């Protein structure tokens, strides 16, 4: 579960390396984000000579969490890190590659571009 002040790794080649969540979008009274939720984040670490810089406010989609995700068939999916993909206002990824695995739940939320870029779908 991702909440405000949580640090996340960036799982794409957009230039950002670490994000800090400052807001969960569309949460209402819920203050936490799970896989597939959109967050507002600040870039805390960035690669040099890339379009995204530190202290820039961006939108991102959470693709992996340390908190387990329970599916209806009984399968439990858990990751070693919290990771996100930086997106633009239309929901398309800013990078051209996605590193690591993503879950099938992103397909239901219409993030098919992220799924097509990922090397592994769980």
From Swiss-Prot:
Name recorded for this polypeptide? Large ribosomal subunit protein uL14c
Molecular function GO labels: large ribosomal subunit rRNA binding; structural constituent of ribosome
Under the subunit heading, UniProt states: Part of the 50S ribosomal subunit.
Q: Which UniProt keywords apply?
A: Chloroplast, Plastid, Ribonucleoprotein, Ribosomal protein, RNA-binding, rRNA-binding
Similarity section: Belongs to the universal ribosomal protein uL14 family.
Q: InterPro entries recorded for this chain? A: Ribosomal_uL14, Ribosomal_uL14_bac-type, Ribosomal_uL14_sf
Q: Where would you say this protein principally sits, based on its record?
A: plastid
Entry keyword annotation includes Oxidoreductase: no
Listed GO biological process terms: translation
The record's listing under Pfam families reads:
Ribosomal_L14
Localization per record: Plastid, Chloroplast
A GO CC annotation given for this chain: chloroplast
Q: What does this protein do?
A: Binds to 23S rRNA.
């Amino acid at each position: 579960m991702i909440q405000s002040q949580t640090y996340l790794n960036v799982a794409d080649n957009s230039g950002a390396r670490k994000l800090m969540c400052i807001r969960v979008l569309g949460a209402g009274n819920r203050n936490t984000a799970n896989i597939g939720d959109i967050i507002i984040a600040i870039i805390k670490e960035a690669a040099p000579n890339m379009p995204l810089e530190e202290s820039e406010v961006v939108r991102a989609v959470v693709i992996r969490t340390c908190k387990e995700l329970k599916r209806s068939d009984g399968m439990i999916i858990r990751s070693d890190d919290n990771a996100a993909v930086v997106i633009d206002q239309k929901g398309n990824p800013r990078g051209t590659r996605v590193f690591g695995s993503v879950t099938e739940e992103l397909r239901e939320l219409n993030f098919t571009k992220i799924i097509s870029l990922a090397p592994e779908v769980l």
